[in-house]
């Protein structure tokens, strides 16, 4: 009888099983952009606004 409270406490402290996605992916679902894609897009925006290439040899200054 002494083990029952200990067992219940350990059961409550244990992590639950990972949940399964209830909705399977359909052809209309669009995957979210990854962190790498977001960083790449963020770094490209200032270059596009200035009209400069990556090497700064063809900057037009517009």
Curated annotation (Swiss-Prot):
Which keywords describe this protein according to UniProt? Amidation, Cleavage on pair of basic residues, Disulfide bond, Neurotoxin, Secreted, Signal, Toxin
Tissue specificity, in the record's words, reads: Expressed by the venom duct.
Residues forming the propeptide are 23-48
Where does the record locate the signal sequence feature?
1-22
Its annotated compartments are: Secreted
Q: Where Valine amide occurs, residue numbers?
A: 60
Listed under GO cellular component are:
extracellular region
| Free-text description of this protein's post-translational modifications in UniProt | Contains 2 disulfide bonds that can be either 'C1-C3, C2-C4' or 'C1-C4, C2-C3', since these disulfide connectivities have been observed for conotoxins with cysteine framework V (for examples, see AC P0DQQ7 and AC P81755).
Pfam families, A to Z: Chi-conotoxin
What GO MF annotations does this protein's record show?
Answer: toxin activity
Which residues form each disulfide bond in the chain? Answer: none
For this chain, the family text in UniProt reads: Belongs to the conotoxin T superfamily.
Question: What domain notes does the record hold?
Answer: The cysteine framework is V (CC-CC).
- The protein here is known as Conotoxin Qc5.1
| Species the sequence originates in | Conus quercinus
* Organism classification: Eukaryota, Metazoa, Spiralia, Lophotrochozoa, Mollusca
